[in-house]
Amino acid sequence: MSVSKTLCAVSAVPEGGAITAHIESSTGGFDLVLTRKDGRISAFHNECPHAGRRLDWAPGEFLIENGLLICAAHGATFDIESGHCAGGPCRGVGLRSVPVEIVDGNVCLR
């Protein structure tokens, strides 16, 4: 049985919204965006594929409209469930997903 890293409680991720979670690594770590749509949690690197900028406009604050996460830097839009780019300068290149699972009411890295 493998041990997975707990990111947060499922209840911490608002329906139709997003939060950040930090992952420590030997290179200093990185931030994830955790989203929730219809109860399903998705996780992505907090980095726009267009220019490598963070997606949040302030730490942990995201612009989301009609199920689309909007990059604060250049306005690219991404589906909050799939990470697919719906419009903007990165059309056709989606967010890098990170596999997660729900364990005892917590979101964990898979």
PLM segments and residue spans:
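Short Gly/Pro-enriched loop/turn and capping motifs at secondary-structure junctions
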Residues: 76-77, 84
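N-terminal pre-ligand scaffold of iron-sulfur
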Residues: 1-65, 79-80, 94-110
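Short cysteine clusters
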Residues: 48, 71-74
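Short cysteine/histidine-rich metal-coordination sites, predominantly Zn2+-binding motifs
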Residues: 62-71, 85-93
